[in-house]
A protein has these predicted regions:
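Short glycine/serine- and small hydrophobic-enriched flexible loop segments
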Residues: 85-93, 147, 194-201, 302
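Conserved catalytic neighborhood of penicillin-recognizing serine enzymes
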Residues: 109-143
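Short, conserved catalytic-motif segment at the N-terminal edge
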Residues: 49-72
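Structured C-terminal helix/loop/strand segments within mature extracytoplasmic catalytic/sensor domains
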Residues: 4-45, 64, 71, 199-233, ...
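Mid-domain, small-residue-enriched loop/turn segments at the edges of structured enzyme/sensor domains
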Residues: 47-51, 146-201
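Active-site SXXK
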Residues: 61, 74-102, 272-274
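A short glycine/serine-rich beta->alpha loop
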Residues: 66-74, 115, 119, 178-181, ...
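Short, glycine/proline-biased beta-turn/loop segments that scaffold the active-site neighborhood
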Residues: 93-119
Length: 305
């Protein structure tokens, strides 16, 4: 398992700030405007959607755009990020063996997403499960990792990272009953953006842990929301010929769309997070939510290039 810090990650320097602004009254001063993003988010908010957004300039360490970024909302599959951090920390400390084999039959079946459920391989090593979790949002692989490290350990890691508005509540489930947690995970846009900024600046646990988690996240195949504006190949975008540095993670559930990541080009680098909780009453409601993410992606590309 490669645990060396990435050189391009080290080149992105930024401090974290806790400044917040309510939607939607702040855009990048003196640089690119986020007018289109603000309009798209205003339209969503007017339709009753709950929105939390944060963009931070990595070089300046200042807020570029913030709206209700302190509000805790469901983040669906983006909750695997602290799980991956705990797994990487376990590898580094020797508490976990990356090649330890986990048998699928020992994990309760879940079909909400991912590919392991469709593979013939009945068992995989922890390191491969981490790759599946990051790359394909594999719920079964994530549950296997969570069963191995334990929910208390991930919650302790979240507390250690200072994420007071984030929580991993439960396993992935096909259906949530009255005795189950209502969501897989919770978070705020500010904390999500901070975590991704810290990852590329080698500040999460240690440089090697940060590099490992950033590497896993760089395999993510879901470039359909904010990342759709990058023009990157969903299946091969680790080394972009145009000098674009990009990692992201998305979260999806009924009426929930979330994306957080880092986007850096020759002009600037940003960490970003957008959470939208909406009434998924029709395809038009869903597409309107998706469109807001894509508009943000276009504005971010203009900002970094």
């Amino acid at each position: 398992v490669g645990m060396e810090p990435r050189r391009d990650a080290e080149s992105l320097r930024g401090a974290r700030r806790s400044t917040s602004r309510r939607l939607p009254r702040r855009a990048a001063a003196g640089r690119r405007s986020f007018t289109s993003t603000l309009k798209a988010l205003d339209d969503l908010a007017a339709s009753g959607a709950k929105i939390s957004v944060r963009i931070t300039d990595l070089d300046r360490g200042t807020s570029v755009l913030a709206g209700d970024d302190f509000v805790t909302l469901p983040v669906a599959g983006l909750g695997v990020v602290p799980l991956l951090i705990e797994v990487a920390a376990g590898f580094e400390a020797g508490r976990l063996d990356p090649l330890e084999i986990i048998d699928r039959s020992r994990v309760d079946p879940v079909t909400v997403g991912g590919v392991w459920q469709h593979l013939k391989a009945p068992a995989l090593p922890l390191s491969d499960l981490a790759v599946l979790t990051a790359a394909t949002g594999d719920a079964l692989a994530a549950n296997a990792l969570l069963a191995r490290v334990g929910l208390p350990a991930v919650r302790a890691r979240i507390e250690e990272l200072g994420l007071s508005r984030s929580a991993l509540l439960d396993l992935f489930r096909d259906e949530r009953g009255p005795d189950d947690a209502p969501h897989f995970a919770l978070g705020s846009a500010r904390e999500l953006a901070e975590v991704f900024a810290a990852l590329v600046n080698s500040q999460v646990v240690s440089p090697s842990v940060s590099a490992q988690v950033a590497e896993w996240l760089s395999f993510n195949h879901d470039l359909s929301l904010v990342a759709s504006a990058t023009g990157l190949d969903p299946f091969s975008h680790e080394n972009d010929e145009h000098g674009l540095l990009f990692i992201n993670k998305t979260g999806r559930d009924a009426g929930i769309r979330v994306e957080a990541g880092v986007l850096a080009g020759p002009r600037a680098g940003v960490s970003y997070a957008l959470i939208v909780c909406f009434d998924d009453l029709s395809i038009s409601h869903r597409l309107r939510a998706h469109d807001a993410f894509r508009v943000l992606g276009t504005d971010l590309m203009e900002y970094v290039f």
